[in-house]
């Protein structure tokens, strides 16, 4: 019950807080997007809600059509995964660094980027502020895509901004 209250509080705070999103760098071989919001929650509660990805990720941006099938195992080499049934599933990203309630880093190509010759580094930072926590979500992507990666920067920024 406490976890559900934390998640609900996180989601309500996000809905009420002004968010900031920007593609900070773009080139044919990659891009960086940064999304940030201040939530009315402690870093521990913000962290707990963030790693409960199945509770807040949009079902529109899943393979299964059901965000409840999404999960993050917040340990080194843990999985940001989506279950597709009894034995089927997708590894969207792999956890590469964990500092609970402070930072979570994942590596891989999210969504259609996972089908291309690219790699990404996604970092979620949690910083205590007066009255809440600043959640900063940075995703840097580089590699090869026919026609150039710059065309993916806007759509990826939109999806991540919608999630945050």
Where in this protein do the model-derived segments appear?
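Intrinsic-disorder/low-complexity, polar/charged segments enriched in Ser/Thr/Lys/Arg/Asp/Glu/Gln
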Residues: 30-38, 67, 79, 90, ...
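Short beta-edge strand/loop motif at the mouth of beta-sheet-based domains
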Residues: 53-92, 101
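Hydrophobic ligand-binding cavity/cleft-lining segments
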Residues: 19-71
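A conserved amphipathic terminal alpha-helix motif
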Residues: 28, 134, 140-164
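Bacterial N-terminal signal peptides that target proteins for export
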Residues: 1-8
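Hydrophobic pocket/interface hotspot
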Residues: 46-49, 80, 95, 106, ...
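Hydrophobic-ligand binding "helix-grip"
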Residues: 22, 71, 85-132, 140
């Amino acid at each position: 019950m406490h976890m559900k209250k934390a998640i609900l509080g996180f989601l309500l705070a996000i809905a009420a807080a002004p968010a900031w999103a920007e593609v900070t760098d773009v080139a044919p071989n990659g891009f960086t997007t940064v999304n940030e919001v201040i939530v009315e929650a402690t870093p521990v509660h913000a962290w707990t809600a963030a790693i409960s990805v199945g509770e807040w990720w949009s079902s529109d941006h899943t393979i299964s059509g059901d965000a409840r099938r999404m999960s993050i195992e917040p340990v080194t080499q843990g999985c940001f995964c989506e279950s597709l049934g009894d034995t089927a599933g997708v590894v969207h990203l792999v956890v590469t660094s964990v500092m609970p309630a402070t930072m979570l880093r994942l590596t891989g190509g999210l969504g259609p980027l996972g089908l291309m010759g690219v790699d990404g580094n996604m970092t979620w930072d949690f910083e205590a502020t007066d009255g809440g926590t600043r959640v900063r979500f940075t995703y840097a992507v580089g590699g090869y895509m026919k026609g150039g990666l710059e065309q993916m920067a806007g759509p990826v920024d939109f999806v991540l901004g919608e999630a945050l």
